[in-house]
């Protein structure tokens, strides 16, 4: 009996461990700063007015266009979602069978089990019903800024950026990660771009410590909210 209880406890612990969300780890090489692949050639002083080292247009701004350049992304994300679902199933059935004769003969009305006449009439009725309602709402807001580096410049001029920011506090650590694609036209003169203009954005905000632990439900709550709960 004790061995059976131990097996059930071990199985429950394994199932609950699968409900825990993975925690982001520091020093992910994917979000490491991207440095230029090759050093830029030294500008040749071949004239007092025109020099071959300057490749920018005369009327263009000095923006981040090369691999390894730095861009600041201002985070201004607000999302909200709501979902309602309801279902109701009901089934009623009934049947009555009335017979006055059986094979051409009328049955005897003598009831050996008590008073009253016997009858061939029969009937049944049944009723089944099920009803369910569910509702889920969620809202998130993320504001701030993060400075990333240019990881790649695509042939069509789209710039791929990615980066992360770790903040070590007294009660733990907080992490902000972002990766995505931006247009050169969306970059302001101070090399900033809003997060709403980042295509295919992958934004992660998580943390460790007492604050992060306090915002997580307990293991028993996760069990009741998981698909393992049969009701």
Swiss-Prot record:
Residues 1-18 form the signal peptide. GO terms for biological process: bacterial-type flagellum-dependent cell motility. Keywords: Bacterial flagellum, Cell outer membrane, Lipoprotein, Membrane, Palmitate, Signal. A lipid is attached at residue 19 (S-diacylglycerol cysteine). InterPro entries: Flag_Lring. NCBIfam families: PRK00249.1-4. Belongs to the FlgH family. This is Flagellar L-ring protein. It comes from Pseudomonas putida (strain W619). The gene is flgH.
